[in-house]
């Protein structure tokens, strides 16, 4: 199933990351990849100038790099996480 590029999809993907204890911040920056991960503080900083599609793609790309506690996720988040990870592996 393809992930739709809507605000609702973005909110759901953000929820997965937040349920794992990470803080997502949207800020200006000159990161080449469009994001920066501060593992020690569990902070993910994304380029605030990205459109919704760019934000979703960036979160999908970086999710395999994050430490996600699958058991701490809600049932809906677990299903979406599996879907996102399958999408990330296809890339």
What annotation goes with each model-predicted range?
Residues 1-32:
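Auxiliary, metal-adjacent structural segments of Zn-dependent hydrolase domains
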Residues 33, 53, 66-91:
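Post-HEXXH active-site segment of zinc metalloproteases
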Residues 43-46, 62-67:
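Short, low-complexity, polar/charged sequence segments that are solvent-exposed and flexible
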